[in-house]
Amino acid sequence: VIIGDIMELHHKKHHATYTNNLNAAEEKLAAAHAEGDIGGMIALQPALKFNGGGFINHCIFWTNLSPQGGGVPEGDLADAINRDFGSFDSFKTTLTAATVAIQGSGWGWLGFDPKTHHLKIATCVNQDPLQATTGMVPLFGIDV
């Protein structure tokens, strides 16, 4: 259970900050590109990665939430979790262990690996986006 006030703060402060900072970095990137300033474009990469990742990660995060809670997966997702983790309980244990091990900020993810066609647990530091850093498609994310 997540308290509504915490989610409101998270949305209005954290996600909004990533969005605003990404927009500012994109404007600077466009200006640097127009001026042919390759050094300026390269210098913006950390801001684009951090704020772009924060924006993407939180957009995915919001789609994972439900006022009534999600409950136990059903259908194809449940079948894939059982195939790749043995059971839903085993999946939760694996995901919990991975996210608890993150030092500082980061994300715990359930992702689909298009190379193996299996679900995997992955963690990313700070705001690194799952797909851009691992090639996996994010299905469910936990902001740590």
Swiss-Prot record:
EC number(s) reported in the record: 1.15.1.1
Superkingdom of this protein's organism: Eukaryota
Class of the enzyme per the UniProt entry, highest EC level: oxidoreductase
Protein name stated in the entry: Superoxide dismutase [Mn], mitochondrial
Taxonomic path: Eukaryota, Metazoa, Echinodermata, Eleutherozoa, Echinozoa
Subunit structure: Homotetramer.
Residues reported in the UniProt entry to bind Mn(2+): 10, 58, 143
Family according to the record: Belongs to the iron/manganese superoxide dismutase family.
A Gene Ontology term for the protein's cellular component: mitochondrial matrix
Catalytic reaction list: 2 superoxide + 2 H(+) = H2O2 + O2
Natural source organism: Apostichopus californicus
GO molecular function annotation: manganese ion binding; superoxide dismutase activity
This protein's UniProt keywords: Manganese, Metal-binding, Mitochondrion, Oxidoreductase
Record bears the keyword Zinc-finger: no
InterPro entries according to UniProt: Fe/Mn_Superoxide_Dismutase, Mn/Fe_SOD, Mn/Fe_SOD_C, Mn/Fe_SOD_N, Mn/Fe_SOD_N_sf, SOD_C_sf
Function recorded in the entry: Destroys superoxide anion radicals which are normally produced within the cells and which are toxic to biological systems.
